[in-house]
Every structure is written in C-alpha cells, then in structure tokens.
Amino acid sequence: MLTFQQLILKLQSYWDAQGCALLQPIDLEVGAGTSHVHTFLRAIGPEPWRAAYVQPSRRPKDGRYGENPNRLQHYYQYQVVLKPAPENILDLYLGSLQALGLDLKQNDVRFVEDDWENPTLGAWGLGWEVWLNGMEVTQFTYFQQVGGLDCKPITGEITYGIERLAMYLQQVENVYDLVWTEWEEPGPNGPVKRRLTYGDVYHQNEVEQSTYNFEHADTAVLFRRFAEHEAEAKRLMGVREEGAADDGAAVPQLALPAYEQVLKAGHTFNLLDARGAISVTERAAYIGRIRNLSRLVAQAYYDSRERLGFPMCGTAAAPAATEAA
C-alpha cells in the first residue's frame, strides 16, 4: 500500500526525472497551487519554466468541522507547471499515474472537458478534469491568460488532488482514515507495526479552523486588513490613492512584494465570504478589486523581466505582452 507521504515522494521522483525544479510551497495562505508565485508569475512572458511542488491550500467556505469524509477547508495539491506545454503532456501525466502503481488497462481514466477560470487572478485556460474510476483526481489546464495578459507560450498546468488520489489508491472512503505513514518499532514479542493517519494529523485542525472560519473570525478586523493589503499592493505598484499626501518618497514597482499583498487580500476576502459578511453584489466588487491588483502585478512583473532581457530565454528578443480587452 502506498502511504500518503509515499505518494508525494513518487510524484516528486517522477517529475524530477522530467526536468522539473522541485520547489517548496509558498508560505502564505492560498486557495490553490496556481496562486504560487512560481505558477502565476512564471506563466507570464516568454521564459521557459518547469516546476513541481506540493501546495497546502485553504478554502475557508469548504470546511465542515471535520464531519465530512471528503471535504476540507485545508488540503493538499501537487502542482506541475510546464512552459511551454510539451506536445506529450498527456502522456507524461498518464506516466505519472503508472509511477504510482496504477495499471491504466485495469482502471477507467477519463478526460472530461472543464475549462478553468480564476477571476481574482484574471486568469483562465482550456482544460479537463481527470476522472479515475468516477472520481475527479486532477485538473489539467492550458493557460490562455494570466493577470489579464495573453500567455505566450502556453503554459501547461497539472494539479493533482492528493487526498482524493490517495483515497483511491488506499481504497478508503473517509479522508481521515488515510494512512499518512507507517513503520515498525521493536516490541517485547517482535516488531510492532505503527501507523499515523490523516485524521491524527489534521482532524482537530479541521474542527477548530472551521469554527474560526464560520463563527469567530473578526469581520471588523478582516475588513480593515483587506483595505490595508489593497492599499499596500497599490503603493508597491506606484499607484497613489486619491487624496493621499505626497511624501516625496517614490516607490519603484515591486511586483513580487505587491503580489504577496494581493494573496493576503485574497485570503482575507475568502474569510469574509465564509463569515457571510459580504453580500452577492459586494462579492463581485471585491473580486474585481483583487483582479485589478493582479493585473497591475502581472504587467509590472512582465516589464521587469523584459528590462532584464528575459534572461532565461537566452535572448533579449521577445514579443510584447498583450493585454486582453
């Protein structure tokens, strides 16, 4: 049986062999691996990029107090980014399933058309859900736009739902029953097998974080935080707020620090949404505000790489960024 952590190690080994940089998760609260700086920003511009990493993902509204067998407010994705998307990307993905021990002839693997969109990031792509014997385990996307900029070349993204994949491989119906790891310890009558489950690691976290997300997150503090993160992102993009005093301190466009503020604003918005503190009309407006910040950051990042001559291309010549109408 493949344990939860062995599954991750096998994916790491497989994608390492395909030339991917094995990176670490971004150390901020994000709702998906796509929000990682090494997907969102690296998809912009002409420079090639191959990376893979585990990303803890938080979606406050999806919490169920640890009572739902397959729905979590905190879970893991395994993210693979290939730019430009290779022609054999589907074969590479199927090869990764075989590396996990899946016999493709004995299992029903289906690609179901499901185009992807992330409104807050100004991003969308053509793609598919991958269903393994009737369960969605992966999202497959060809990025068309990121931060409102056309992707040239197209980036291929593969996002594995690690818990769901592990549940199938271990043949369990409750995520908390997943075996995270197992080992043997010496005992008085011989070796004793021990195991650590997903529930041992995360069940209490699901209960308490759900309680916070739905009942105790301070909305007044969250509204203030959102405004602060938004203002800081704008300041780092050189956008002066109306009525703000001119202190004479010019800030260069700092795309990477500004993007961190965008991510913080996004998570704050998700908490407000979970608390029911934002109306349907306000929700659309907040999403628009975050999207506008994402577009500013995307253009600033592109411009900064262009000034450097797109060093990972090996040439200074590259097409101009094209913003969608």
UniProtKB/Swiss-Prot annotation:
Record's subcellular location: Cytoplasm
Alphabetized Gene3D superfamilies for the sequence: Bira Bifunctional Protein, Domain 2, Class II aaRS and biotin synthetases, domain 2
Keyword Transcription tagged: no
Molecular function (Gene Ontology), one example: glycine-tRNA ligase activity
EC annotation from Swiss-Prot or TrEMBL: 6.1.1.14
One BP annotation, GO: glycyl-tRNA aminoacylation
Entry GO CC: cytosol
Name of the protein this chain belongs to: Glycine--tRNA ligase alpha subunit
